[in-house]
């Protein structure tokens, strides 16, 4: 018996060591930028600059957009898209929950599937396990015959050695006409009319007037097909047949009826073209689809575009960089006036990002950027890069090591002075709500800045966390 216990202890110890190596140490072996992708990005940049050179010679682009910064609007636009779907819906999301807004989306998807629309739902395995495994509403949707649900890198014994590779994408595709892409997850924190416990964020709605011929829509479709068929994506099977979920289907139907009463145009909205504006060009950039280490493709694309400008504004919830990423910031700041807007520690909703900023603040400033510590009413989850007055890069990518090397990420590179002006207006307000900290250490409070001091409990919490997170900052 003693020998058995000893052997079992050794086996468990070896297994834990292997898990630690695979999930903590191996992700430290960062992949480097590739020259092949650098050529692709350079071609993308050249194509965009050609559009800028002579607008008169460019045929009118079929892509029209609407920028969504309000959480309730974000829910309404999703419901409109789903409510007007005729053939097919694709929803890919990192964090879907069966809360008020999340169950509203489930209800809309069920209603669409019930009238014959084919629904494909792709969810990351972590939050599916945490928030949906026990949801009968979700299980009912899975059982619907016109719905197929797949899970990216599900939490199973077979996948225990790749826990840190997550799908961070957030997009919705409807038919061959439109998509919505941005930084919002599918839950009450990001969608709906709640006023507390929320994050501010941004989506881009793209409406295609050419019926499926838009470049960015085709790029997103191609990306979806690649990730949908990845090796570490598994089909979610229903526990029971549809008849078992009669009560849940009634609940979903009631939920959808309530949404139709509250938002009366979600099935008959027809002002897609009137409520959007034309853009010159949209290009999708991604980080790869594999559940494994990634090349820093999105950051490469951002750097390439930023180096063409004289002014660069980076909006990110937090900054967690390694040597290469600091080098990118320094290279950009040497060429352009570079501002980085991030949540102030006193306001940020992510304790890991806030803690790393306390540890790394001077390194960020040493790159030559000007930091803006934002004290917004709600934590800001938006991710955007503005280059001069015409280029906007919007999507799911945070300026951190997880987004750069571990997770799937999507960003839209949009050539549009109108969008740039719209986002810039928001960023200007954010900067007025911030404390400006220049690379030489000078500080200045914006006209709308509201000072807040961390209470003693939080100060103690961050003091302890600052020590703990150092070895794991590449995973935050």
Segments the model singles out, each with a brief description of its role:
Residues 2-148, 157-168, 174, 178-476:
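Charged, low-complexity intrinsically disordered terminal segments
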